[in-house]
C-alpha cells in the first residue's frame, strides 16, 4: 500500500497527472490536476483502489484530502470516481460544513448525486466532519500561473468530471467573458455556473 509519491510531474491531463519517481511514471487520478505543472517537484498523497479490472491510484495535495476521499468512498452509492468528482467541484472545507449541517439539497448539485445518495452521505458522515470544519484543516491550493490553452483545458476537465458536452457548451460563453485565469480557476468558475443551473 502506498502512502505518497514524491517526484517530478511529467504529464498534466484534464483527469490525471503522471509523476515520475525513480524512473517510473505513475498515472494518478486527482480532483485538481491543474494545481500541478509539468516539471514541478511534488508530493502526492495516494489511495490505491484495486478492482477486478485493474488498479487505480487516486492522488491528493494533502493527507486531509485523502482522508475525506476515503470517507466519501465508504458511503453506499458513492464510488471512487464520484468521490473524486465531488471533491473537484467544491472547496473541501465547505463540503465538510455542508455534510455537518445536513444540507441535502446542496449535495444534490454535484454530478451523479441524487437526493437518496445525498441523504446517505449525510447519514453516514454527519458527526465525522467536525474536526475538518473546526480546525480548518483544508487549505486553498496556491494559484497556478495562467497558460494560453487554460480555458480549453478547463472545458475538457469539466467533461472528464461527468458533465455533458451540452452543459459545457452552455457555460463556455460565460467563461470567455471572464478575465484570463488559470485552468484550475476556470474549472472552479465553470463548476459554479453549472451548479447554479
Swiss-Prot record:
One GO term (biological process): DNA repair
Region annotation (Domain III) ranges: 150-197
One Gene Ontology term of the molecular function aspect: four-way junction DNA binding
Segments of this protein annotated with the region Flexible linker: 141-150
Alphabetical UniProt keywords: Cytoplasm, DNA damage, DNA recombination, DNA repair, DNA-binding
CDD domains named among the record's database cross-references: UBA_RuvA_C
Residue span of region Domain I: 1-61
Principal localisation: cytoplasm
Subcellular location: Cytoplasm
Keyword DNA repair: yes
Region listing for Domain II, in residue ranges: 62-140
GO cellular component: cytoplasm; Holliday junction helicase complex; Holliday junction resolvase complex
InterPro entries documented for this protein: DNA_helicase_Holl-junc_RuvA_I, Hlx-hairpin-Hlx_DNA-bd_motif, NA-bd_OB-fold, RuvA, RuvA_2-like, RuvA_C, RuvA_C_sf
Alphabetized Pfam families for the sequence: HHH_5, RuvA_C, RuvA_N
Subunit structure: Homotetramer. Forms an RuvA(8)-RuvB(12)-Holliday junction (HJ) complex. HJ DNA is sandwiched between 2 RuvA tetramers; dsDNA enters through RuvA and exits via RuvB. An RuvB hexamer assembles on each DNA strand where it exits the tetramer. Each RuvB hexamer is contacted by two RuvA subunits (via domain III) on 2 adjacent RuvB subunits; this complex drives branch migration. In the full resolvosome a probable DNA-RuvA(4)-RuvB(12)-RuvC(2) complex forms which resolves the HJ.
Domain topic, free-text comment: Has three domains with a flexible linker between the domains II and III and assumes an 'L' shape. Domain III is highly mobile and contacts RuvB.
HAMAP family linked: DNA_HJ_migration_RuvA
Family membership noted in the UniProt record: Belongs to the RuvA family.
Record's function text: The RuvA-RuvB-RuvC complex processes Holliday junction (HJ) DNA during genetic recombination and DNA repair, while the RuvA-RuvB complex plays an important role in the rescue of blocked DNA replication forks via replication fork reversal (RFR). RuvA specifically binds to HJ cruciform DNA, conferring on it an open structure. The RuvB hexamer acts as an ATP-dependent pump, pulling dsDNA into and through the RuvAB complex. HJ branch migration allows RuvC to scan DNA until it finds its consensus sequence, where it cleaves and resolves the cruciform DNA.
Identification of the protein by name: Holliday junction branch migration complex subunit RuvA
Organism of provenance: Lactobacillus delbrueckii subsp. bulgaricus (strain ATCC 11842 / DSM 20081 / BCRC 10696 / JCM 1002 / NBRC 13953 / NCIMB 11778 / NCTC 12712 / WDCM 00102 / Lb 14)
Gene: ruvA
